[in-house]
Amino acid sequence: MANVVVIGAQWGDEGKGKITDLLSRSADVVVRYQGGVNAGHTIVVDDKVLKLHLIPSGILYKNTSCLIGSGTVVDPKILLKEIDMLIDNGIDISGLKISSTSHVTMPYHRILDEAMEADRGSNKIGTTGRGIGPTYADKSQRNGIRIRDLLNKERLSDVIEIPLREKNGLLEKIYGIKPLKLEDIVEEYLDYGERLSKHVVDCTRTIHAASKNKKNILFEGAQGTLLDLDHGTYPFVTSSNPISGGACIGAGVGPTLIDRVIGVAKAYTTRVGEGPFPTELQGSINDQLCDRGSEFGTTTGRRRRCGWFDGVIGKYAVSVNGLDCLAVTKLDVLDELDEIQVCIAYDLDGEKIDYFPTNSDELKKCKPIFKKLKGWQCSTADCRKLSDLPENAMNYLRFLAELMEVPIAIVSLGANRDQTIVIEDPIHGPKRALLR
C-alpha cells in the first residue's frame, strides 16, 4: 500500500490530469484536496476528449472512489454539468463523493470576482473569473456556505442572509451592479443540493476508513507550486495551497499518512495570466511550443505563455513539496528543435543566484542563465520504453534529473494514455526511480 500526492511543479497546466489518470488505475481512492473550477484537466480516452474541472480523473475507473475534499471549493452548477457529461459518455459516477464541509461558490462570488478584476485595470492578477478567490475569502472570514448547508432550506436561508446583504452592498454601491435576490438563490441552490445529496459524505472519516483498510489513496492537487498562496509568485497566485502540504489540510489527514510525493513538470515551462516568468520566450520558438503543445487553458481557453524549462523553480518545487520523483510531460513537443535550453540559474542585479526569489519584484528582474543542449529532431511519440528514446532525448532527461536532484519515474510523450513510459509505478513500485 502507498498513499501518493500528485502536485504541479511549475505554474499549473503541467499535465497532472493524465498522470493522475494513469496512477488512478492502481488507486482505490482519489482525493481532490484544493482549488475549484479555476483548474482544469483534459483526459483522452479512446479518442474521446474529456475536460474536467472538479471531479478527479479517477472517476474513469469504476472500482475507484473519487472524493472532492474539504479544501476544495465547489461550484455545484458546474459540478452537475460534469456529472451529466460523464453519464452521457457512459461513465459510472456512483463512486463520486463530496465532502459535506467543502465550501460553495455562490453567484455573488463569480460576479464579484469579475468586477474586482476589471477594476484593477493594468494591475490585473489574471484570475479566471470563476469566483474562487471570493469563495476562499468568505471561508477565511467565516462567512461561507458549505455543501451541507444546501441540504436544508431553513439552514441555507439563515446562513446566506448576512453574506448576501454584504455582497449586495458591494455590488450595488461600489460596482453599480444590480443586487441579487435571496429567494432566487435559495431556490436554485436547494435544487443543486438535492441532486448532489447522495454523493455527500464526511471527508475525513471516509479517507481514514480507507486508510485503515489498507487502501491505496491518491491525493490530486490542482494548479501548481508557483501558484501557491503562501509559496508562489504572490500576488499572482491562486487562493489555496496546491503544494503537497495542502493535501493534509484539504483532505483532513496527518503528514504521516503520506508515503511519497510525485511532481509533474512539462519538459518546458508555461504560465497563464499575469506575473513574472524568467524563461519566457518570444517569437517563432514560443509559437512552435504553443502550437505543438496545444497551449490553451482548459478552463479559460487563454493562450499560455511558453518558455524554456526553468531548473531554478524546479529545485524550489522539489524543496517545498519534498518530491520523491518526477513525471516529465510533453517531451514530444520538443521533437523538432535542434537546440534546447534549460535555465540553471538567474542573474539578479549582476549576481548569479541559484535560488528562487519569492519576492515578485525581484523575480521580475531575474535574467535566466541557460545551459544549451542538443535536440533530437525526430519523433518520440511512439516510444514506449527508455531504450526507444533518441540518445539526445535521454541526455535531456538525465540533465533535468541531475539539475533538480530528483529521479524521473514517468515520461509522457503525448495526450493518449499509451503515450507514456512508466519507469516506476510510484504506488506499487519501490521507493526509487531508474532515471537519474
Curated annotation (Swiss-Prot):
<feature type="binding site" description="in other chain">
    <location>
        <position position="223"/>
    </location>
    <ligand>
        <name>IMP</name>
    </ligand>
</feature>
<dbReference type="GO" id="GO:0044208">
    <property type="term" value="P:'de novo' AMP biosynthetic process"/>
</dbReference>
<dbReference type="GO" id="GO:0000287">
    <property type="term" value="F:magnesium ion binding"/>
</dbReference>
<keyword id="KW-0342">GTP-binding</keyword>
<feature type="binding site">
    <location>
        <position position="304"/>
    </location>
    <ligand>
        <name>GTP</name>
    </ligand>
</feature>
<keyword id="KW-0963">Cytoplasm</keyword>
<dbReference type="GO" id="GO:0004019">
    <property type="term" value="F:adenylosuccinate synthase activity"/>
</dbReference>
<feature type="binding site" description="in other chain">
    <location>
        <position position="238"/>
    </location>
    <ligand>
        <name>IMP</name>
    </ligand>
</feature>
<feature type="binding site">
    <location>
        <begin position="412"/>
        <end position="414"/>
    </location>
    <ligand>
        <name>GTP</name>
    </ligand>
</feature>
<dbReference type="InterPro" id="IPR027417">
    <property type="entry name" value="P-loop_NTPase"/>
</dbReference>
<feature type="binding site">
    <location>
        <position position="142"/>
    </location>
    <ligand>
        <name>IMP</name>
    </ligand>
</feature>
<dbReference type="Pfam" id="PF00709">
    <property type="entry name" value="Adenylsucc_synt"/>
</dbReference>
<protein>
    <recommendedName>
        <fullName>Adenylosuccinate synthetase</fullName>
        <ecNumber>6.3.4.4</ecNumber>
    </recommendedName>
</protein>
<keyword id="KW-0479">Metal-binding</keyword>
<feature type="binding site">
    <location>
        <position position="40"/>
    </location>
    <ligand>
        <name>Mg(2+)</name>
    </ligand>
</feature>
<dbReference type="InterPro" id="IPR001114">
    <property type="entry name" value="Adenylosuccinate_synthetase"/>
</dbReference>
<feature type="binding site">
    <location>
        <begin position="330"/>
        <end position="332"/>
    </location>
    <ligand>
        <name>GTP</name>
    </ligand>
</feature>
<comment type="similarity">
    <text>Belongs to the adenylosuccinate synthetase family.</text>
</comment>
<feature type="binding site">
    <location>
        <position position="13"/>
    </location>
    <ligand>
        <name>Mg(2+)</name>
    </ligand>
</feature>
<feature type="binding site" description="in other chain">
    <location>
        <begin position="13"/>
        <end position="16"/>
    </location>
    <ligand>
        <name>IMP</name>
    </ligand>
</feature>
<dbReference type="InterPro" id="IPR042110">
    <property type="entry name" value="Adenylosuccinate_synth_dom2"/>
</dbReference>
<keyword id="KW-0658">Purine biosynthesis</keyword>
<feature type="binding site" description="in other chain">
    <location>
        <position position="128"/>
    </location>
    <ligand>
        <name>IMP</name>
    </ligand>
</feature>
<keyword id="KW-0547">Nucleotide-binding</keyword>
<keyword id="KW-0436">Ligase</keyword>
<feature type="binding site">
    <location>
        <begin position="12"/>
        <end position="18"/>
    </location>
    <ligand>
        <name>GTP</name>
    </ligand>
</feature>
<dbReference type="GO" id="GO:0005737">
    <property type="term" value="C:cytoplasm"/>
</dbReference>
<dbReference type="GO" id="GO:0005525">
    <property type="term" value="F:GTP binding"/>
</dbReference>
<dbReference type="InterPro" id="IPR018220">
    <property type="entry name" value="Adenylosuccin_syn_GTP-bd"/>
</dbReference>
<feature type="binding site">
    <location>
        <begin position="298"/>
        <end position="304"/>
    </location>
    <ligand>
        <name>substrate</name>
    </ligand>
</feature>
<feature type="binding site" description="in other chain">
    <location>
        <begin position="38"/>
        <end position="41"/>
    </location>
    <ligand>
        <name>IMP</name>
    </ligand>
</feature>
<dbReference type="InterPro" id="IPR042111">
    <property type="entry name" value="Adenylosuccinate_synth_dom3"/>
</dbReference>
<comment type="function">
    <text>Plays an important role in the de novo pathway of purine nucleotide biosynthesis. Catalyzes the first committed step in the biosynthesis of AMP from IMP.</text>
</comment>
<feature type="binding site">
    <location>
        <begin position="40"/>
        <end position="42"/>
    </location>
    <ligand>
        <name>GTP</name>
    </ligand>
</feature>
<comment type="subunit">
    <text>Homodimer.</text>
</comment>
<dbReference type="InterPro" id="IPR033128">
    <property type="entry name" value="Adenylosuccin_syn_Lys_AS"/>
</dbReference>
<feature type="active site" description="Proton acceptor">
    <location>
        <position position="13"/>
    </location>
</feature>
<dbReference type="GO" id="GO:0046040">
    <property type="term" value="P:IMP metabolic process"/>
</dbReference>
<dbReference type="InterPro" id="IPR042109">
    <property type="entry name" value="Adenylosuccinate_synth_dom1"/>
</dbReference>
<keyword id="KW-0460">Magnesium</keyword>
<feature type="active site" description="Proton donor">
    <location>
        <position position="41"/>
    </location>
</feature>
<comment type="pathway">
    <text>Purine metabolism; AMP biosynthesis via de novo pathway; AMP from IMP: step 1/2.</text>
</comment>
